[in-house]
Amino acid sequence: MKVYINPGHDLEYDSGAIHTDGNGDVDLRECDVAARIGALAKQYLEAAGCQVRMLQSDNLCNDSEYSDRPVAVCDDANDWGADVFVSIHCNACAGHDARGTETWCYAEGTDGALLAEKIQAQMVGSLDTTDRGVKVMPGLMVLKHTDMPACLVETAFIDNDADAELLRTGYDDFARAIARGVTDYQQTKMAQ
């Protein structure tokens, strides 16, 4: 199985959501968390026999108009012929006490929804996070412009202190859960 991993945001141009310490200084960035989880998930998937390609960029499609970032994530995944696509992110909800994990797919009843369900179940079961469920988000670029089953994982709320601590210390647990979700999806599809 060919798995395309897209850690969310960009290390240089758009760090995504952040967590700040008691002094108001940024101590955790979404792009860093996603990159670390993605790299570990890649290792676990390769150990399970998957071919894995990973690209972290905020250039999602060729029409994104980022001339300084020539490779577009969705186009690269499509051209490579990935069997599944997983985008890894951290959620944020400034000014609220939101917590937990949710996974987004393009539409209900699709292979992308099945992939999202398998990853969501593994993350909630392994990390005991609040289960915010699988949600349909057809407007998201990485779900709309990929040719293969795709999902976007919101691991936890980076701006919630308790979730931020889990993100800070649980990289490996998140990565293992994502990898197991992908292999659970693969096993389900093979059994059909």
Predicted features along the sequence, with ranges:
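Active-site histidine-acidic residue metal-binding/catalytic motifs
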Residues: 1-73
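Soluble non-cytosolic domains of exported or imported proteins
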Residues: 28-36, 67-71, 109-114, 165-173
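Extracytoplasmic/secreted envelope proteins and their assembly/folding machinery
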Residues: 38, 42, 74, 113-120, ...
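A short, glycine/acidic-enriched catalytic loop
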Residues: 12-29, 91-118
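Active-site-adjacent substrate-binding region
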Residues: 110-135
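Active-site-adjacent mobile loop/cap segments within catalytic or ligand-binding domains
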Residues: 4-6, 12-19, 75, 80, ...
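Loop/turn elements at helix/coil->beta-strand transitions in domains of secreted/extracellular proteins
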Residues: 1, 45-53, 80-85, 130, ...
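Surface-exposed patches in mature extracellular/periplasmic domains of secreted proteins
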Residues: 52-57, 88, 129-136
